[in-house]
């Protein structure tokens, strides 16, 4: 997989994980807050419930049975109460915790009484008109009010209920045991008398507070029940409120829950960020830092991967394989390995080229200096008035000067040719040629050259006819240079064979001799310009550029050239062309 696709899938996966994590955390937080909110609401029973809240917790199955959420049941239990769902006919469709004295069917008169008094027998009631599955129902929530029970007990114990000063001591003890209080109020809400009351409660005991209590009973520490004795007298009973949770306390409690949930979310996110930071440091930081160190090494000429204390490349294990943290960038490290090896190879090649260039310049300087010395010496002799040269001597010196000049001219021409070949600036005109007569003609012309005397040069081919498209002038130069090299570096009596062969797809030309041969170093540099040099004193004088020129001309004909040689056995130079 290409690196950019790796990055794409990797970061897509990371973003997906982050989104999933945030989604899970938000959903979990929502459920946590909902559960805590429900718990807080259930503490006040169903007194805070709204129609929408109740409808959300109720459902009717296809068989007509009711699904009631535990939240509602828990809220009813908190008040030690009961719950009924009444249909439009007044019949009970669902009930929970209903006592035996609560009817299962209600008349219109009873329902009207419930609407007015919010009471049923000894029970206080809350009611809601709800709509489930497009059907209307009445939900009743009833509970035995301890303050109402206190009033009922006092009525039973005392004949004159409005004469608090004459209550029996047993009645007063009963009121105190129930942690209750009894108040007698006039029509203006003024306290006329009280039993077991407190100063703070007396301050808030008025008609306005009684009305407020009826709308939000959970905001009051004391549960209140009122009995109208006559138009001028009210009796009020109070006991500890079992569903006392003020709106302010509820909001504070819920805020704490929200803050706690936010803290948990932030803590999880913080831990995730720390984990991702460490993970990214090992996943991306180490490989990137290692790559930078590697590039710094290369820039300083240290052509190797950074190593650990054991001397092993940092990204590799003992088996030479890429370590786990570095595998994601495997392609980059492979490229870095290739780059490092290429730089090493280029450095070695530069060093070899530098050495070859120095040798080439030294040899070329030598071969230019030698003929120049001869020319300079003879010119000085001819210029001198000290000697009187005969015509024969002048002719002999002129011949030497001409030969040395021709050699230098040939050397310059060969240098120019090699650079033209290197820069693809040499024109070539290839035409289909019959190779056997062409090679025989070139060999015969070469054998006529005086410096080829004493060498057994022959042409061998088992084929009768072979054709190939070539430039005759430049191909003649190839063969002459190869033959000249064989003659130049081997003694007289050496057998030199030019062998022409063909296969189904290729044509091969071999120049084979049984001469001195070459060592490996000479073979390696054989086609470098002026590697072996030359000397104008040799009878087989040349420029030292013959094989370099031959190689470039072979490449110009889309061929390849190879050398096989063994010291004291001989040399075979093979040229291979692909048939067109």
UniProtKB/Swiss-Prot annotation:
Its EC number is 2.7.13.3. The chain crosses the membrane at residues 7-27, 262-282. It is a multi-pass membrane protein. Keywords: ATP-binding, Cell membrane, Kinase, Membrane, Nucleotide-binding, Phosphoprotein, Transferase, Transmembrane, Transmembrane helix, Two-component regulatory system. InterPro entries: 2-comp_sensor_kinase (IPR050351), HATPase_C_sf (IPR036890), His_kinase_dom (IPR005467), HisK_dim/P_dom (IPR003661), HisK_dim/P_sf (IPR036097), Sig_transdc_His_kin-like_C (IPR004358). It is an enzyme of class 2 (transferase). This is Sensor histidine kinase YvrG.
